[in-house]
Amino acid sequence: MTNERKEVSEAPVNFGANLGLMLDLYDDFLQDPSSVPEDLQVLFSTIKNDDSIVPALKSTSSQNSDGTIKRVMRLIDNIRQYGHLKADIYPVNPPKRKHVPKLEIEDFDLDQQTLEGISAGIVSDHFADIYDNAYEAILRMEKRYKGPIAFEYTHINNNTERGWLKRRIETPYKVTLNNNEKRALFKQLAYVEGFEKYLHKNFVGAKRFSIEGVDALVPMLQRTITIAAKEGIKNIQIGMAHRGRLNVLTHVLEKPYEMMISEFMHTDPMKFLPEDGSLQLTAGWTGDVKYHLGGIKTTDSYGTMQRIALANNPSHLEIVAPVVEGRTRAAQDDTQRAGAPTTDHHKAMPIIIHGDAAYPGQGINFETMNLGNLKGYSTGGSLHIITNNRIGFTTEPIDARSTTYSTDVAKGYDVPIFHVNADDVEATIEAIDIAMEFRKEFHKDVVIDLVGYRRFGHNEMDEPSITNPVPYQNIRKHDSVEYVFGKKLVNEGVISEDEMHSFIEQVQKELRQAHDKINKADKMDNPDMEKPADLALPLQADEQSFTFDHLKEINDALLTYPDGFNILKKLNKVLEKRHEPFNKEDGLVDWAQAEQLAFATILQDGTPIRLTGQDSERGTFSHRHAVLHDEQTGETYTPLHHVPDQKATFDIHNSPLSEAAVVGFEYGYNVENKKSFNIWEAQYGDFANMSQMIFDNFLFSSRSKWGERSGLTLFLPHAYEGQGPEHSSARLERFLQLAAENNCTVVNLSSSSNYFHLLRAQAASLDSEQMRPLVVMSPKSLLRNKTVAKPIDEFTSGGFEPILTESYQADKVTKVILATGKMFIDLKEALAKNPDESVLLVAIERLYPFPEEEIEALLAQLPNLEEVSWVQEEPKNQGAWLYVYPYVKVLVADKYDLSYHGRIQRAAPAEGDGEIHKLVQNKIIENALKNN
């Protein structure tokens, strides 16, 4: 394949429609430079020193009136800006445009003779050396902007990017395929369509979400990966929904036909997994439908050894987009070093394939594209391909969006958009070429709208003519791209018609041979679907001990700043108190300091940490202060970049005001780099439900469905403190409902030292078969509560404890109160004011897995126990009560009374009035501590 391209440089100046005015101003400048604005003085000084410019401009001006030039410029601008509306991008059923701006020569009272008398340089600054006159140049522009690729880039604000695109698009350029390459491209299409036809014939009615109508997607991906290989990009991350997924798996990731057909036959596909280990396919114990599954292929098929990953995906359209971005960033980051990670955008690139109805319809796309240029999230440019079959299930565009194109939503992110006819395979390749060049040059996203159609219904059991009869009359008559391109090659004499049909038949034979290798009797019929033995136990404590001096060295380093760094005095007083646990007998380590010490020791162990959230650098509640700001210069300093003997990076970023995309990004990052301790912190836990799709469809079910492991940690501020229904509850009950098969750890802590040991335990589990998500109902007011803060000796040894008890005399206890988090602290402080040895408070630090054995062992030590109470802040239908009740009921059996104390059932999580909150909270505490 050769690319014939004439390079041209941009002229020093192009005044366009303002030519007449600028010449007048130039004359004024020659007489008196100070008579024109300063910026024009600089420009005119440059022009004055170039003898070739002004005479050419004056020649054009003298031959043509300013009015003529203005009309020419208006025509040119319209072609660039609106030519896409008349482009040949629709293989079938072109839309009827009601309002199209003027785009023809005649519309501007111009003709060939007039235009032939005007310099081509007026049309475009780089045309002067290519075309003889404006007429030739405009014909070129019409062909270019109204051809099989429709270009939209005039909305881009950056002049350099816009100018680059203009030159790249308008410079004569042609992708020239030799005959062998054309044959190879035809064969690619024949395999793509032949695969679909075979499945359609042999598995009638089976859902496969056919690619037919946008078949060119596969050669476009192959072209993209080949270009990436030449650029040295060795990690390709692909995200897509179900449409065309099976074809991409087989023809891009090279999943054997035998494996794919086995899945349709419900036999074991893993028997056909390549023995060379080049294809990685993980599976969970409950599994998922075939068109949700992904895989990883290591191959040199595209020019160099590359790792090509197709992300697993639920049916929730577009939600995989931020996951793919996170996976890509993880592949780009070097985290095995001290300080912050270094990011190399040439290591990996993301390709995200969207649907035309879902792309403008799903808000996750807005959130994800907003990450594109942010320091903590950029991946150096994503390639977005819209598989535009111009319908969503049964909904047509008129009911699906309020814009001309499904891609219009991308304009707000200053990215170029190319619409390309899916039946013009060579045009689709050129669109990829331009997109990849732009990404390489500017490290920004590009959107390609692959405009085609959908051969069948939404799925293969659906009849589209019920709701879309007219379009499908034309689609049924329309040849597939395999035949469109094949006939083109026949007409060009590249192949004969017999060769075309012979190869199409050969594809069917190859598929039949693969099919015949499968034993129909080898059914997968195990209904038990047991979780792996590695998940039999809860998160195990990391009981590494530390000397006092070791932790003091870390603490001192975290409180040492560069010379001349000016910390706000008010903040400095707070930070200086962190010396007290090491300098004073009664010094205590609060929550934030416990976290800093844990992070530092984890970094020393070689585990990188990445923490993001809307205010995570400081902390919503002004407690963390992980990034310090010089009060005079604004410069920043991150102490955790300077830990003694640090072996891994600490990366912290304030996130955009987004939950779903940011959590999806962190999930993807951790899936790709399982050694990374990824933490997402909600501003308030109440806002976490904006990420519910990520929780439901990825984080808590991915291992069961796909065998995909994640150790993402969530910090969700949760406590009832009179701040109303939207600043009180992280919806603990929802996470407990998602908890099963040891798929996560859910905690609500009351001790800073237990928090320290928990973080270390989670870090130790990463990149092991025991890794799993961690959900922390993190504190708010407890961040500074002295009851939560602990002495340093609780940090030097020990490990995470699932329950904590107060000191007690066993034979005096008649009532046990089980509580968690702030509720436990409130009860403890109330009991301290009115001591009662008959009441034993037990902090349930780990809610899932529920600590049955620990509680059972404790209750067995209390010979006079009469009552067990569960006490919570949340309403009865929320919080942990409905989850813990079956466990506690079994433990209590008929030996003790069981009672509940908390808010009554409520539709909203909390009261809106702070004073009423206090009354209700005090009543709960009073009733709970009352000894019947």
UniProtKB/Swiss-Prot annotation:
Pfam families: E1_dh (PF00676), OxoGdeHyase_C (PF16870), Transket_pyr (PF02779). GO terms for biological process: glycolytic process; tricarboxylic acid cycle. The keyword Oxidoreductase applies. SMART domains: Transket_pyr. GO terms for molecular function: oxoglutarate dehydrogenase (succinyl-transferring) activity; thiamine pyrophosphate binding. It comes from the Bacteria. It catalyses: N(6)-[(R)-lipoyl]-L-lysyl-[protein] + 2-oxoglutarate + H(+) = N(6)-[(R)-S(8)-succinyldihydrolipoyl]-L-lysyl-[protein] + CO2. Keywords: Glycolysis, Oxidoreductase, Thiamine pyrophosphate. GO terms for cellular component: cytosol; oxoglutarate dehydrogenase complex. Its EC number is 1.2.4.2. It is an enzyme of class 1 (oxidoreductase). Its cofactor is thiamine diphosphate. The keyword Oxidoreductase applies. InterPro entries: 2oxoglutarate_DH_E1, 2oxoglutarate_DH_E1_bac, DH_E1, KGD_C_sf, ODO-1/KGD_C, THDP-binding, Transketolase-like_Pyr-bd. Belongs to the alpha-ketoglutarate dehydrogenase family. E1 component of the 2-oxoglutarate dehydrogenase (OGDH) complex which catalyzes the decarboxylation of 2-oxoglutarate, the first step in the conversion of 2-oxoglutarate to succinyl-CoA and CO(2). Homodimer. Part of the 2-oxoglutarate dehydrogenase (OGDH) complex composed of E1 (2-oxoglutarate dehydrogenase), E2 (dihydrolipoamide succinyltransferase) and E3 (dihydrolipoamide dehydrogenase); the complex contains multiple copies of the three enzymatic components (E1, E2 and E3). This is 2-oxoglutarate dehydrogenase E1 component. It comes from Staphylococcus aureus (strain NCTC 8325 / PS 47). The gene is odhA.
